């Protein structure tokens, strides 16, 4: 699915991505000399709010190993950004204990589906089971009334 590219917004994402990688200790520049790398990073930090300069910095200084990773990160961010606009495509998050996640993950693998699909399946099965149980209870009560009269 294609999503509209918003240059100013995406330049901000690229800047944040590069700064995060740098803070995590990764080499984000193509420069071998540390003084050149430090100067390039200082320049990057100065141009946070200059989208066209961020793009020029990427062309001039960014490590080639990061090129695909940056493209993938921006593509994913773009998808999340546009999906968040509509309720039915917006992702929700839940906290699970590890053992619960592990059981759910195993069940999803058995079913050959995603975790979301597995949760949906298990909920519908539980609902079906509950309705069947109520029906059996109702039949037992009716049978009991018939036998006692």
Curated annotation (Swiss-Prot):
Subcellular location, record wording: Cytoplasm
Keyword Hydrolase assigned: no
One cellular-component annotation, GO: cytoplasm
Cited InterPro entries: Arc_rbn_hlx_hlx (IPR013321), MatP (IPR009390), MatP_C (IPR035375), MatP_N (IPR035087), MatP_N_sf (IPR038339)
Signal peptide stretch: none
Disulfide-bonded cysteines: none
GO molecular function: sequence-specific DNA binding
One BP annotation, GO: cell division
Protein name: Macrodomain Ter protein
The organism of origin for this protein: Vibrio parahaemolyticus serotype O3:K6 (strain RIMD 2210633)
Originating gene: matP
């Amino acid at each position: 699915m294609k999503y509209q590219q918003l240059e100013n917004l995406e330049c901000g994402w690229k800047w944040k991505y590069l700064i995060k990688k740098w803070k995590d200790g990764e080499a984000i520049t193509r420069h071998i000399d540390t003084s050149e790398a430090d100067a390039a990073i200082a320049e990057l930090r100065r141009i946070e709010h200059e989208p066209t300069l961020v793009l020029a910095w990427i062309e001039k200084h960014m490590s080639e190993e990061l090129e695909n990773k940056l493209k993938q990160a921006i593509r994913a961010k773009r998808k999340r950004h546009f999906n968040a606009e509509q309720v039915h495509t917006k992702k929700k998050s839940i906290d699970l204990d590890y053992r619960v996640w592990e059981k759910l993950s195993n069940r999803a693998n058995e079913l050959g589906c995603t975790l979301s699909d597995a949760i949906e399946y298990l909920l519908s099965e539980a609902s079906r089971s509950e309705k069947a149980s109520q029906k059996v209870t109702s039949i037992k009560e009716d049978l009991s009334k018939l036998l006692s009269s």
